[in-house]
Regions:
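Active-site-proximal specificity loops/subdomain of glycosyltransferases
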Residues: 3-65
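GT-A fold catalytic core of metal-dependent nucleotide-sugar glycosyltransferases
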Residues: 38-117
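Catalytic core and acceptor-binding pocket of nucleotide-sugar-dependent glycosyltransferases
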Residues: 49, 115-214
Length: 214
């Protein structure tokens, strides 16, 4: 990822969110429980406050035209594709991938507009309150918000095979279904999701060595 960012002069932030928790009201836990009352896991939802931070010059000290979230289990395999490429040929403000399960926000690309700042704020606040304890909290927040104005017509979807493909012949699903979303040499990244950590590292190393990514 660092090498890709260096090529395009991007400013990356790497954040380990795997054990983060944030104080947020939720009706789904017992407020009287001193261990969990009022606390919901950050994990996937951390992407919304982080995106919001880098969309506001008064917070981050920069005026960013675009912001991007890329899960740390994604390996960029095609350095020739800049982030701005995904905004070519359309006027949408948000770019997401889709896979067999629908919305797949392992990569989130946004123009820095008032509408998108509103979206990440809404996902961070209302989305968190509704879905903070859900295993796919970020996905559910997007599904809810993107179904309605003012956001419904501001998103452009690309296949996960193009943006964040699955490693070939790894995930246990019907082969004909899986093949629609598996990595090809034209894929931008490979997404090593829902796998044992050591297995992810092993697959990542294979891609790095085969494609000379470092």
């Amino acid at each position: 990822m660092r090498k890709y960012c260096e090529k395009w002069n991007y400013a990356p932030l790497f954040e380990d969110c795997s054990t983060r928790q944030e104080k947020k009201h939720t009706p789904w836990v017992d407020d009287k429980d001193p261990e969990i009352g009022h606390y919901v896991p950050m994990r996937t939802m951390i992407k919304f406050p982080l995106l919001e931070h880098f969309m506001r010059e008064e917070d981050c000290g920069q005026n960013n035209d675009y912001v991007a979230w890329i899960d740390n289990d994604c390996v960029v395999t095609n350095y020739s594709v800049p982030i701005t490429k995904w905004f070519d040929g359309h006027d949408k403000d948000l770019v997401l991938a889709f896979d067999v399960n629908g919305v797949h926000p392992t990569i989130i690309l946004m123009r820095n507009t008032v509408l998108m700042r509103g979206l990440v704020w809404a996902c961070k606040e209302a989305g968190w309150r509704m879905y903070g304890m859900h295993g796919w909290s970020d996905i559910m927040a997007f599904r809810f918000m993107l179904d309605y104005p003012p956001y419904a017509d501001r998103v452009k979807f690309f296949s996960a095979q193009e943006m964040c493909a699955m490693p070939p012949m790894v995930h246990p699903m019907p082969a004909d279904v899986r093949s629609q979303f598996e990595w090809t040499p034209d894929s931008w990244t490979v997404h090593l999701s829902a796998l044992d950590l050591q297995y992810r590292v092993s697959i990542a190393q294979q891609f790095v060595e085969k494609l000379g990514l470092i």
